[in-house]
């Protein structure tokens, strides 16, 4: 193949890969999610336009702080296609994260989206880790913005041990997905074999079981 033709082909292929790396583009003005449909597609099927209302594009759930009542000290309120049906095929979503004093949003990833946070209140230590195990960390304050690249492990921690904090997160996916590193490893169903975890973390079975017990549902 002529080198110029190969170069042109490679460029087209690269552009195609980039385009396919995010949520697919919409092919019509509206494709409001029909969450009752049993049909499985990459996203949701569209409800009939005659059934679409303004409410399909509205959500009031991130206007005020969430109640934080867990051991890590943070609560995430999603504003994605599961809450706003009109986001289907649009490739964007939001979330609000509220932190108790000293609260942490533990290390996690979003496999389908880059995240941008805007600090509403407080001061947070934030950071992400590259595949080369390099940490990029920063302290961000009210009115400031920080970016977490798609798929990389990241975290946020409220610096203030006396006051709460909150951020708004924006994603370039209607449903970015979240995998908490610790919970994923220690609460998977079926469970990851203990010998995998003991070898990975270089600790004994008793320590593994102790960690798992921390994530077990609390008995009422």
Swiss-Prot record:
The family classification in the record reads: Belongs to the germin family.
Q: Which residues bind Mn(2+)?
A: 108, 110, 115, 154
Mind telling me what this protein is named?
Germin-like protein subfamily 2 member 4
* Keyword Oxidoreductase carried by entry: no
Species this chain originates from: Arabidopsis thaliana
Instruction: Identify the taxonomic lineage of the organism of origin.
Output: Eukaryota, Viridiplantae, Streptophyta, Embryophyta, Tracheophyta
Q: Which GO terms describe its cellular component?
A: apoplast; plant-type cell wall
Disulfide bridge positions per record: 31-46
Query: Origin, by domain of life?
Result: Eukaryota
Instruction: Write out the annotated subcellular location.
Output: Secreted, Extracellular space, Apoplast
The record describes the protein's role as: May play a role in plant defense. Probably has no oxalate oxidase activity even if the active site is conserved.
For the Cupin type-1 domain, which residue ranges apply? 58-209
Q: Which UniProt keywords apply?
A: Apoplast, Disulfide bond, Glycoprotein, Manganese, Metal-binding, Secreted, Signal
Q: Which residues are glycosylated?
A: 51, 69
Q: Which Pfam families match?
A: Cupin_1
Q: Which SUPFAM superfamilies match?
A: RmlC-like cupins (SSF51182)
Q: Which GO terms describe its molecular function?
A: manganese ion binding
């Amino acid at each position: 193949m002529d080198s110029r033709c190969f170069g042109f082909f490679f460029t087209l292929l690269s552009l195609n890969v980039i385009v396919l790396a995010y949520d697919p583009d919409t092919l019509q003005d509206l494709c409001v999610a029909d969450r009752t449909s049993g049909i499985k597609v990459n996203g949701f099927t569209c409800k009939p336009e005659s059934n679409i209302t303004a409410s399909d594009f509205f959500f009031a759930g991130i206007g005020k702080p969430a109640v934080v009542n867990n051991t890590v000290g943070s609560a995430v309120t999603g504003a994605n296609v599961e809450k706003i049906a009109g986001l289907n095929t649009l490739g964007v979503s939001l979330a609000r994260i509220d932190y108790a004093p000293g609260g942490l949003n533990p290390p996690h990833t979003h496999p389908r989206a880059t995240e941008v946070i805007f600090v509403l209140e407080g001061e947070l230590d934030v950071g992400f880790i590259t595949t080369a195990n390099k940490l990029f960390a920063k302290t961000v304050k009210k009115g400031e913005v920080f970016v977490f690249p798609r798929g990389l492990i990241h975290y946020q921690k409220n610096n203030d041990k006396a006051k709460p904090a909150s951020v708004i997160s924006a994603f370039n996916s209607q449903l970015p997905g979240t995998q908490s590193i610790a919970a994923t490893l220690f609460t998977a169903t079926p469970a990851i074999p203990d010998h995998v975890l003991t070898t990975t973390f270089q600790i004994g079975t008793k320590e593994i079981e102790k960690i798992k017990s921390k994530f077990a549902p609390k008995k009422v």
